Amino acid sequence: MAAAIASSLIRQKRQAREREKSNACKCVSSPSKGKTSCDKNKLNVFSRVKLFGSKKRRRRRPEPQLKGIVTKLYSRQGYHLQLQADGTIDGTKDEDSTYTLFNLIPVGLRVVAIQGVQTKLYLAMNSEGYLYTSEHFTPECKFKESVFENYYVTYSSMIYRQQQSGRGWYLGLNKEGEIMKGNHVKKNKPAAHFLPKPLKVAMYKEPSLHDLTEFSRSGSGTPTKSRSVSGVLNGGKSMSHNEST
Protein backbone atom coordinates (compact mmCIF):
# COMPACT_ATOMS: atom_id res chain seq x y z
CA MET A 1 0.00 0.00 0.00
CA ALA A 2 2.73 2.44 0.94
CA ALA A 3 4.57 1.68 -2.26
CA ALA A 4 1.43 2.37 -4.26
CA ILE A 5 0.88 5.71 -2.49
CA ALA A 6 4.50 6.68 -3.05
CA SER A 7 4.25 5.81 -6.69
CA SER A 8 1.06 7.86 -6.96
CA LEU A 9 2.71 10.88 -5.30
CA ILE A 10 5.72 10.59 -7.57
CA ARG A 11 3.44 10.52 -10.62
CA GLN A 12 1.53 13.57 -9.37
CA LYS A 13 4.76 15.53 -8.78
CA ARG A 14 6.06 14.55 -12.20
CA GLN A 15 2.82 15.66 -13.86
CA ALA A 16 2.91 18.94 -11.90
CA ARG A 17 6.49 19.62 -13.05
CA GLU A 18 5.57 18.87 -16.68
CA ARG A 19 2.63 21.28 -16.49
CA GLU A 20 4.91 23.99 -15.11
CA LYS A 21 7.43 23.40 -17.88
CA SER A 22 4.77 23.59 -20.57
CA ASN A 23 3.43 26.86 -19.14
CA ALA A 24 6.92 28.29 -18.90
CA CYS A 25 7.63 27.45 -22.53
CA LYS A 26 4.84 29.76 -23.63
CA CYS A 27 6.64 32.87 -22.33
CA VAL A 28 10.26 31.82 -21.75
CA SER A 29 12.79 32.04 -24.56
CA SER A 30 14.08 28.82 -26.00
CA PRO A 31 17.88 28.67 -25.60
CA SER A 32 18.33 27.03 -28.97
CA LYS A 33 16.20 29.41 -31.09
CA GLY A 34 16.18 32.51 -28.87
CA LYS A 35 12.48 33.29 -29.58
CA THR A 36 9.42 32.88 -27.36
CA SER A 37 6.26 31.22 -28.53
CA CYS A 38 4.61 34.65 -28.28
CA ASP A 39 7.23 36.01 -30.65
CA LYS A 40 6.65 33.07 -32.96
CA ASN A 41 2.95 33.82 -33.05
CA LYS A 42 3.69 37.46 -33.91
CA LEU A 43 6.08 36.39 -36.64
CA ASN A 44 3.48 34.06 -38.07
CA VAL A 45 0.94 36.89 -38.19
CA PHE A 46 3.45 39.28 -39.80
CA SER A 47 4.55 36.68 -42.32
CA ARG A 48 0.97 36.03 -43.32
CA VAL A 49 0.36 39.76 -43.78
CA LYS A 50 3.56 40.07 -45.81
CA LEU A 51 2.68 37.04 -47.90
CA PHE A 52 -0.78 38.46 -48.52
CA GLY A 53 0.73 41.78 -49.58
CA SER A 54 3.23 40.12 -51.90
CA LYS A 55 0.44 38.16 -53.55
CA LYS A 56 -1.35 41.44 -54.18
CA ARG A 57 1.73 42.93 -55.80
CA ARG A 58 2.11 39.90 -58.04
CA ARG A 59 -1.37 40.45 -59.42
CA ARG A 60 -0.33 43.77 -60.93
CA ARG A 61 0.31 43.32 -64.61
CA PRO A 62 3.63 44.71 -65.82
CA GLU A 63 3.68 47.46 -68.41
CA PRO A 64 3.66 46.03 -71.94
CA GLN A 65 7.18 45.98 -73.27
CA LEU A 66 8.13 46.32 -76.93
CA LYS A 67 11.57 45.37 -78.15
CA GLY A 68 12.91 48.00 -80.52
CA ILE A 69 16.26 49.51 -81.42
CA VAL A 70 18.17 52.75 -81.08
CA THR A 71 19.56 53.38 -84.54
CA LYS A 72 20.79 55.84 -87.12
CA LEU A 73 19.14 55.96 -90.54
CA TYR A 74 21.66 56.45 -93.33
CA SER A 75 20.16 57.65 -96.61
CA ARG A 76 21.39 56.32 -99.93
CA GLN A 77 21.82 59.98 -100.87
CA GLY A 78 24.78 60.18 -98.47
CA TYR A 79 23.13 61.78 -95.43
CA HIS A 80 22.07 60.70 -91.97
CA LEU A 81 18.45 61.51 -91.24
CA GLN A 82 18.20 63.89 -88.29
CA LEU A 83 15.47 65.43 -86.17
CA GLN A 84 16.73 68.67 -84.66
CA ALA A 85 15.73 70.31 -81.37
CA ASP A 86 13.33 72.74 -83.10
CA GLY A 87 11.55 69.88 -84.89
CA THR A 88 13.35 70.31 -88.22
CA ILE A 89 13.70 67.08 -90.21
CA ASP A 90 16.58 66.92 -92.69
CA GLY A 91 19.80 65.13 -93.57
CA THR A 92 23.29 65.76 -92.23
CA LYS A 93 26.76 64.46 -93.02
CA ASP A 94 27.78 64.88 -89.38
CA GLU A 95 27.92 61.30 -88.12
CA ASP A 96 28.44 62.45 -84.53
CA SER A 97 25.26 64.53 -84.33
CA THR A 98 23.10 63.33 -81.44
CA TYR A 99 20.03 64.35 -83.43
CA THR A 100 20.63 61.44 -85.82
CA LEU A 101 19.65 58.91 -83.14
CA PHE A 102 16.17 57.43 -83.44
CA ASN A 103 14.02 55.03 -81.48
CA LEU A 104 12.46 52.52 -83.84
CA ILE A 105 9.48 51.22 -81.89
CA PRO A 106 7.46 48.29 -83.30
CA VAL A 107 3.75 49.14 -83.16
CA GLY A 108 2.47 46.41 -85.46
CA LEU A 109 3.54 43.75 -87.95
CA ARG A 110 6.35 45.44 -89.91
CA VAL A 111 5.02 48.79 -88.67
CA VAL A 112 7.20 51.18 -86.66
CA ALA A 113 7.10 54.53 -84.94
CA ILE A 114 10.18 56.69 -85.58
CA GLN A 115 11.01 58.86 -82.58
CA GLY A 116 13.94 61.22 -82.07
CA VAL A 117 16.01 60.12 -79.08
CA GLN A 118 16.89 63.69 -78.07
CA THR A 119 13.60 65.44 -78.79
CA LYS A 120 11.13 62.60 -78.06
CA LEU A 121 9.17 63.82 -81.09
CA TYR A 122 7.60 61.40 -83.57
CA LEU A 123 7.98 61.61 -87.33
CA ALA A 124 4.60 61.89 -89.03
CA MET A 125 3.15 62.31 -92.53
CA ASN A 126 -0.11 64.11 -93.17
CA SER A 127 -2.76 63.61 -95.84
CA GLU A 128 -0.92 65.89 -98.29
CA GLY A 129 2.36 63.98 -98.02
CA TYR A 130 4.14 66.56 -95.84
CA LEU A 131 6.49 65.34 -93.12
CA TYR A 132 6.20 66.94 -89.69
CA THR A 133 6.95 66.15 -86.05
CA SER A 134 4.42 65.38 -83.35
CA GLU A 135 4.61 65.25 -79.56
CA HIS A 136 1.78 62.71 -79.60
CA PHE A 137 1.62 59.31 -81.26
CA THR A 138 -1.17 59.33 -83.84
CA PRO A 139 -2.05 57.15 -86.86
CA GLU A 140 0.01 59.57 -89.00
CA CYS A 141 3.10 58.47 -87.04
CA LYS A 142 2.85 54.87 -88.25
CA PHE A 143 5.24 53.80 -91.02
CA LYS A 144 5.40 50.50 -92.84
CA GLU A 145 8.96 49.15 -92.83
CA SER A 146 9.91 47.23 -95.97
CA VAL A 147 13.28 45.71 -96.83
CA PHE A 148 14.56 46.69 -100.27
CA GLU A 149 17.59 45.32 -102.10
CA ASN A 150 21.08 45.43 -100.53
CA TYR A 151 19.55 45.65 -97.03
CA TYR A 152 18.17 49.13 -97.60
CA VAL A 153 14.82 49.84 -95.97
CA THR A 154 11.88 52.01 -97.02
CA TYR A 155 9.36 53.69 -94.71
CA SER A 156 5.92 54.45 -96.11
CA SER A 157 2.83 55.97 -94.51
CA MET A 158 0.43 53.37 -93.17
CA ILE A 159 -2.69 55.41 -93.90
CA TYR A 160 -1.93 57.53 -96.97
CA ARG A 161 -1.13 56.52 -100.56
CA GLN A 162 -2.03 57.46 -104.13
CA GLN A 163 -5.77 56.92 -104.47
CA GLN A 164 -5.80 55.74 -108.08
CA SER A 165 -2.61 53.70 -108.36
CA GLY A 166 -2.29 52.68 -104.70
CA ARG A 167 1.39 53.67 -104.74
CA GLY A 168 2.80 54.30 -101.29
CA TRP A 169 4.01 57.61 -99.90
CA TYR A 170 7.56 57.32 -98.62
CA LEU A 171 9.94 59.04 -96.26
CA GLY A 172 12.73 60.45 -98.41
CA LEU A 173 15.68 62.85 -98.74
CA ASN A 174 16.74 64.54 -101.96
CA LYS A 175 20.32 65.02 -103.17
CA GLU A 176 20.69 68.17 -101.06
CA GLY A 177 19.67 66.34 -97.89
CA GLU A 178 16.26 68.02 -97.76
CA ILE A 179 13.13 66.18 -96.74
CA MET A 180 10.71 65.45 -99.59
CA LYS A 181 6.95 65.18 -99.82
CA GLY A 182 5.94 61.57 -99.44
CA ASN A 183 3.92 61.49 -102.67
CA HIS A 184 7.00 62.68 -104.62
CA VAL A 185 9.21 59.81 -103.44
CA LYS A 186 9.37 56.56 -105.41
CA LYS A 187 10.35 53.38 -103.62
CA ASN A 188 12.84 52.27 -106.29
CA LYS A 189 14.80 55.56 -106.14
CA PRO A 190 17.73 56.32 -103.77
CA ALA A 191 15.68 59.06 -102.07
CA ALA A 192 13.53 56.44 -100.34
CA HIS A 193 16.33 54.09 -99.29
CA PHE A 194 17.67 54.10 -95.75
CA LEU A 195 20.23 51.83 -94.16
CA PRO A 196 19.57 51.32 -90.43
CA LYS A 197 22.70 51.36 -88.27
CA PRO A 198 21.51 49.79 -85.00
CA LEU A 199 23.41 50.85 -81.88
CA LYS A 200 21.54 48.85 -79.25
CA VAL A 201 18.37 46.94 -78.49
CA ALA A 202 15.97 48.75 -76.16
CA MET A 203 12.65 48.04 -74.44
CA TYR A 204 9.81 50.52 -74.88
CA LYS A 205 6.37 51.07 -73.44
CA GLU A 206 3.65 50.86 -76.03
CA PRO A 207 2.88 54.44 -77.18
CA SER A 208 -0.60 55.71 -76.36
CA LEU A 209 -2.43 56.16 -79.64
CA HIS A 210 -4.20 59.52 -79.94
CA ASP A 211 -6.89 60.27 -82.46
CA LEU A 212 -6.05 62.94 -85.01
CA THR A 213 -9.19 64.89 -84.14
CA GLU A 214 -7.90 65.41 -80.59
CA PHE A 215 -5.26 67.87 -81.75
CA SER A 216 -5.12 70.83 -84.05
CA ARG A 217 -2.11 71.16 -86.31
CA SER A 218 -0.50 73.51 -83.80
CA GLY A 219 -0.95 70.90 -81.08
CA SER A 220 0.69 68.26 -83.22
CA GLY A 221 3.88 70.22 -83.65
CA THR A 222 2.74 72.22 -86.69
CA PRO A 223 2.85 75.09 -87.36
CA THR A 224 4.76 77.49 -85.11
CA LYS A 225 4.34 81.26 -85.08
CA SER A 226 7.72 81.88 -86.66
CA ARG A 227 7.19 79.64 -89.67
CA SER A 228 4.83 79.18 -92.52
CA VAL A 229 2.54 76.16 -92.58
CA SER A 230 4.11 74.73 -95.74
CA GLY A 231 7.61 75.20 -94.37
CA VAL A 232 6.98 73.39 -91.12
CA LEU A 233 5.01 70.63 -92.79
CA ASN A 234 7.94 70.01 -95.08
CA GLY A 235 10.20 68.97 -92.24
CA GLY A 236 10.66 72.48 -90.88
CA LYS A 237 12.45 73.90 -93.93
CA SER A 238 11.28 75.89 -96.92
CA MET A 239 10.27 73.59 -99.73
CA SER A 240 12.72 73.07 -102.52
CA HIS A 241 11.45 73.88 -105.99
CA ASN A 242 13.32 70.86 -107.31
CA GLU A 243 12.41 67.76 -105.29
CA SER A 244 13.99 65.31 -107.69
CA THR A 245 15.79 62.23 -106.45
Swiss-Prot record:
Gene3D superfamilies documented for this protein: 2.80.10.50
Residue spans of biased composition, Polar residues class: 215-245
A cellular component term, taken from the record's GO annotations: filopodium
Primary localization class, coarse: other
Keywords recorded for this protein, A-Z: Cell membrane, Cell projection, Cytoplasm, Membrane, Microtubule, Neurogenesis, Nucleus, Phosphoprotein
InterPro entries, alphabetized: Fibroblast_GF_fam, IL1/FGF
GO function terms (MF aspect): beta-tubulin binding; growth factor activity; microtubule binding; protein kinase activator activity; sodium channel regulator activity; transmembrane transporter binding
Gene Ontology BP annotations: branching morphogenesis of a nerve; cerebral cortex cell migration; establishment of neuroblast polarity; hippocampus development; inhibitory synapse assembly; learning; learning or memory; MAPK cascade
Residues with PTM Phosphoserine: S208
Renumbered residue ranges of the record's region Tubulin-binding domain necessary and sufficient for tubulin-binding: 157-164
Region (Disordered): 1-36, 213-245
Modifications after synthesis and translation: May be phosphorylated.
Subcellular localization, as worded in the UniProt entry: Cell projection, Filopodium; Cell projection, Growth cone; Cell projection, Dendrite; Cell membrane, Sarcolemma
Gene disruption: observed consequences: Conditional knockout mice lacking fgf13 in the cerebral cortex or mice lacking fgf13 in most tissues display similar phenotypes of impaired spatial acquisition and memory. The cued memory and the capacity of novel object recognition are altered. They also display anxiety-related and reduced depression-like behaviors. This is associated with a disorganization of cortical structure and neural circuits. The laminar formation of the neocortex is delayed and the hippocampal development is also affected.
CDD domains: beta-trefoil_FGF13
Pfam families cross-referenced by the UniProt entry: FGF
Free-text tissue specificity from the UniProt record: Detected in brain, eye and heart. In brain, the different isoforms display different patterns of expression. Expressed in brain and heart (at protein level). Isoform 3 is highly expressed in cardiac myocytes while isoform 1 is the most abundant in brain.
Residues covered by region (Mediates interaction with sodium channels): 67-201
Region (Mediates targeting to the nucleus): 1-62
Family from the record: Belongs to the heparin-binding growth factors family.
PANTHER family: FIBROBLAST GROWTH FACTOR
Subunit structure: Interacts with SCN8A; regulates SCN8A activity. Interacts with SCN1A; may regulate SCN1A activity. Interacts with SCN5A; the interaction is direct and may regulate SNC5A density at membranes and function. May also interact with SCN2A and SCN11A. Interacts with MAPK8IP2; may regulate the MAPK8IP2 scaffolding activity.
Purpose of the protein: Microtubule-binding protein which directly binds tubulin and is involved in both polymerization and stabilization of microtubules. Through its action on microtubules, may participate to the refinement of axons by negatively regulating axonal and leading processes branching. Plays a crucial role in neuron polarization and migration in the cerebral cortex and the hippocampus. Regulates voltage-gated sodium channel transport and function. May also play a role in MAPK signaling.
Protein's name according to its UniProt entry: Fibroblast growth factor 13
Lineage: Eukaryota, Metazoa, Chordata, Craniata, Vertebrata
